[in-house]
A protein has these predicted regions:
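Nucleotide/phosphate-binding catalytic cleft detector across ATP-hydrolyzing
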Residues: 1-17, 23-208, 225-226, 236, ...
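Short beta-strand scaffold segments in enzyme catalytic cores
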Residues: 20-25, 216-220
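Glycine-rich beta-strand-to-loop/alpha-helix junction loops that act as flexible
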Residues: 81-86, 323-333
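Short glycine/threonine-rich loop-to-helix capping motif typified by GTGT followed
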Residues: 198-200, 330-344
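Conserved structured catalytic cores and adjacent interaction surfaces
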Residues: 205-207, 219, 224-227, 231, ...
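A general structural motif
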Residues: 300-309
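Hydrophobic, well-ordered secondary-structure elements that form the walls
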Residues: 308, 327, 375
Length: 411
């Protein structure tokens, strides 16, 4: 087997509130991505998706990366890192320019996107992504690839995502402290959408709900493009905390109980099935009905799903997501959650498992790895885009140019 070279390796680094996951993918000759290494380590230095302790975060990243390197038999030099947290903001914008030579060139696309990004954002926020939704040429709508088309006026509709400068700088700082470079920083639900959604769903209209430990991340797609993103600061950690308080058990045992026995719909939990609950201090463990646990878990998940529904309504896209809801993320793997979500949303709901990769498929087909696999796929698409831009000459701004603002004067 040929030795893996740095050139055909991609690494996704999902720095989450409850765990750090590193996934190594090798780009194969047939342009598929084979997952060759996975590393995971509990995360201690983040709260609600934001770094609060650099040393702890660095330690978690190092352990996850070392495990992935060992499995893949390679050395990791750079990563695509995810970003989340309630500091994330998003808005839809548009720009208009005149087409110089009556035919759209890559430079015209760059100018119209620059025009679309010319909106006032707070000084403590930086643009993370400018995601084109569609282009219009002389009022002709629905154009995805304008280069080469004729016209005199070019418009762009874009979705802009911004994040706190300090939050992004701290992620970069933690990764660099591990001796690694950051290829790009990607919004986590955008990454997850690459691995769990189909093109048909994005065309028809879909709402992705990525339930992690610290945050629940939402992304809405219609007509093949991203239309709305949001972050809700309630997720799996709140469920764990509810279990710990209600059952009077230490947090680490509450997390284990949630993973093994939790059910999000009380009517699906048997009243006859008992579970053992460790007590605080040196008190003896107790036995409780699994039904009792479900009575603790269901209200929190119902509250979370109601907040997602309220956000979807506020965005104005609730009636446009004909394909329904896709749940993913580590805290979506709870029995009865899909059924509860169908009751709340009154639309089809499915669990999103990572796809579009080969290799360690049995391991990665788990919602826990949705963001990690998505970061690989985003990285690959991005790399292909840069090759295309290099061929076109004057293309859109490179990732490095786009990210320079994060680094300058900060280290």
């Amino acid at each position: 087997m040929p030795k893996k070279t740095e050139k055909n390796l991609l690494v996704g680094l999902d720095i989450g509130t409850s765990k750090v996951v590193a996934i190594v993918g090798e780009v194969m000759p047939d342009a598929t991505i084979e997952v060759v290494g996975i590393g995971s380590h509990p995360s201690r230095g983040l709260k609600k998706g934001v770094v609060v302790n650099i040393e702890s975060t660095v330690h978690s990243i190092q352990r996850a990366v070392e495990e992935a390197e060992l499995m893949a038999g390679c050395q990791i030099h750079s990563v695509y890192a995810g970003i989340a947290g309630s500091h994330i903001r998003s808005l839809n914008s548009h720009g208009i320019v005149a087409i110089k030579d009556k035919e759209v060139l890559p430079g015209d696309v760059e100018r119209v996107i620059d025009a679309a990004r010319a909106v006032a954002i707070p000084a403590d926020q930086k643009i993370l992504h400018i995601l084109p939704q569609e282009f219009l040429i002389d009022n002709q709508e629905g154009i995805k690839e304008p280069v080469g088309m004729s016209g005199v006026r070019l418009e762009a509709k874009v979705h802009m995502v911004t994040g706190a400068v300090s939050a992004a700088q701290n992620i970069i700082k933690c990764v660099r402290r591990c001796g690694l470079e950051v290829d790009d920083i990607i919004l986590e639900q955008l990454a997850s959408s690459y691995s769990v959604l189909t093109d048909d769903e994005k065309d028809l209209g879909i709402c992705l709900v990525d339930i992690g430990g610290g945050t629940t991340d939402i992304a809405v797609f219609t007509e093949g493009s991203i239309r709305h993103t949001a972050v809700i600061p309630i997720a799996g950690d709140q469920v764990t905390n509810d279990i710990a308080v209600a059952l009077r058990t230490p947090t680490q045992f509450a997390e284990e109980i949630k993973i093994k026995y939790a059910c999000a719909l009380t009517q699906m939990a048997s009243a006859d099935e008992n579970i053992e609950v460790p007590s605080v201090g040196d008190r003896a463990p107790r036995r409780l009905a699994r039904h009792t646990l479900a009575e603790v878990v269901e209200p929190r998940y119902e509250e979370l799903l109601s907040l997602v529904q309220a956000e979807l309504r506020r965005s104005g896209f609730e009636d446009l997501v004909a394909a329904g809801i896709v749940l993913t993320g580590g805290s979506s793997k709870i029995e009865g959650l899909v059924e509860l979500a169908e009751e709340v949303f009154h639309m089809p709901v499915r669990l999103g498992l990572p796809q579009y990769v080969t290799g360690l498929v049995d391991v990665v087909r788990n919602p826990i790895y949705a963001t990690g696999v998505g970061l690989l796929l985003f990285g690959y698409n991005n790399r292909e885009q840069r090759v295309l831009e290099a061929g076109l000459g004057k293309g859109l701004k490179s990732v490095w140019e786009r990210m320079k603002g994060w680094f300058q004067g900060n280290f």
